[in-house]
Amino acid sequence: MNFTAPAFVLLFPIVLALHWMLPPSRRWVLLLTASLGFYAVGSPQALPLLAGITLGTYAAALGIAKSKTQTAKKLWLTCAAVLCIGCLCLFKYAGIFRTDVPLLLPAGISFYTFQTLSYVIDIYRGRLMPERHPGYYALFVSFFPQLVAGPIERSTALLPQLHAQERRMDSSGWLWMVRGFAKKLLLADTAAVFVDSVYASPTDASGPAVLLATLLFAGQIYWDFSGYSDIAVGAAALLGVRLSRNFDHPYRADSLRDFWRRWHISLTRWFTDYVYIPLGGSRRGTVRLAVNTMVVFLLSGLWHGAALHFVVWGGVHGALLLLEKALTPCGGKHKAHTWTAVCLRHAYTFSLVCIAWVFFRAASVSDALLLLSRLPVDWSLSTLHTTLLSIGIQPVAELVLGALCLHLLPETSSAAPSPRSVLAFCLLALTVVAAWFSTLHTGTTNAFIYFQF
């Protein structure tokens, strides 16, 4: 379900009102019905697969809990892993080998397969007891705010909240949702117009155009993905459920290691807990640490898509992270804190992240290398002037207005709002509504980037 689609915008307030009108013991029925309904609107053909993985992992978890021997438990775990990873590989990567058999990628499959698999693994490790109520487990898998693009929630965090009878609406959800819609409609979709034009024709791009497109895409993917996460967090908060925060100002990072603590936090934690640490983490020497790091980042790239340029993006991050670790004494514990040193670290981190984004956004590795090779090309004043004019006055105004209002918004609604923040919220909300109606009128609604993963 696309959060900017009319169906969600019109039906979510109805679901919200009904949710708080129902007795607590019946709310799960409404939420499960709404979750499956929202999913069916966007991907009706994928509903049986979602149901199959839900039933399969539910049975596997119960099987592990009932098994008396370790062999039987491993068999149940293996069945769940084959089900989740097998379905993910079939629908996401089968096209690499059989281009004559087109398979539509089910919405959210990369997210809910990881979420259900981590649940079964935690049962196997003895960290929690299985959820025996099939309805609550189905809701855990399909909870609509985070089903399609995360955050990837742990059962220990989400299931108790779904069971809770005394949930309360968190009004900060409105703030989160307005912020998320603003990031998507005012910033991400606006930046996408110029970015798409440059990446569509890399051979014709000038140096200024490549640089500007690279910077704008860094903003676009952050605004787009964090915008979705903000809407998800906000919608869940209004339903009395607290989701994990997926982003923590990643472009404020002063190292690549710091960047990955702040970017797509739920996925980073998943790979850390279920791949990196089981492989040995950093406990088995330098060589093993390097191998484990590269495995995690290559898998992360592959998770994003069945294309070489995604794998290269992951490999670039893994290699740069290892190089940074090797060149940083004492793990970076003794950093210089002068203004110049701090600025240099931020600039270095942002520059490397932006270079890696070129591989992520380009249609192929060759296109990415071509775009990077054109960075030094044609930096004349006339080309620079033409590039800036090609963006247009209206998009620039939307970017500036949206960014300014977002900056003035408070992080949360816990503190007493200032007149400035109230004005920013009202202005941003009105602008978002206008932008939403504009997209409906022009038919230019863009899906969130991470829907394709």
Regions found by a protein language model. Name each.
Residues 1-402, 406, 410, 414-452:
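Membrane-embedded transmembrane alpha-helical bundles that form the catalytic cores
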